[in-house]
């Protein structure tokens, strides 16, 4: 054991490790999307990225990789390479926009090549109430009117965090479970994952409310989870 003291912090966007006064991003990633292209507009910091079936939503975080920009944008590959961007708009299922820190100096319709590493989405920043179909009693109010009932709430993005010795167990509320090995070599350069060596969770339930480690038997317990593993529709 190295004796390092790590603090895990889960937010609505990131999973972080606090160590010696610094925050280290260990947020798990979804599958990499390759062969995306980029478009820019002269005088605007908005960049449009095209990738079919990207399945990204507004607010998602995506890291860009293997960036080769088309000529004429005024940007350098390094302005995008290994950088995180938030999805600003999603015009279509094949396009989304991000914002650079400076304006492009040229208009390029689309071109270049880059890979996308989407962060695992966690959830909204704050709890909100749900208004709409299915809220309040059936037949209450007039057709088309929004319900004013407050008994339905939409939860913020939450994490369930526990440890199995040196290994962090991190579960997104109603989502997947990931692990991060604090005892591994160069641990702070590694991300939480479902395939962490010797602590894999890729065969675990994919939708659980909470996970905890039994202090007596050292079993990992999933609560409010799926009755059929890998079928989120069976979460009970």
Which positions does each model-derived feature cover?
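Elongated alpha-helical scaffolds
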Residues: 10, 153-177
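Short beta-strand elements that form the blades of beta-propeller/WD-repeat-like
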Residues: 4-10, 16, 166-171, 218-228
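Repetitive beta-strand solenoid architecture
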Residues: 3, 11, 50-52, 58, ...
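Beta-hairpin (beta-strand-turn-beta-strand) motif
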Residues: 12, 122-124, 132, 173-174, ...
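Hydrophobic or amphipathic alpha-helical targeting/insertion segments
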Residues: 16, 24-25, 86, 166-180, ...
